[in-house]
Amino acid sequence: TKEYLVLQPNNRIGLVRGYLAEHGFVIRDEALCFENGRHYAIIRAEAGESPRLSALEQELGPVNLQKRPSLLASYARHRLKVHESILYTMEQGEIRGEAYGFSQGMVRSIQHYLEEAEDEGI
């Protein structure tokens, strides 16, 4: 039997996916669920060589983007709100820098994904 990890990160899921890819793990499966007003992402990973993940793949999940589960649009809108909130907080504190630029880019990427998904009727 093959050994694997099952992970359900509560926050900073993009960093978890990025860490897995950079440290000898490949994401084999993912699941999304929505319960009690919260989104949850579950990752199944195993040892192996992973392709480099784009920022959007890290944020929404490479398997999710490929399989397009029914909750993906809702999850993407949730992640969009998270990054918009981060930007708002940083703007209120007049904070700029790498983290600000990352969240700006993520907002654009998720908005673009949602527009494409809507155009495709997903």
Spans of model-derived segments:
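Class I S-adenosyl-L-methionine
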Residues: 1-122
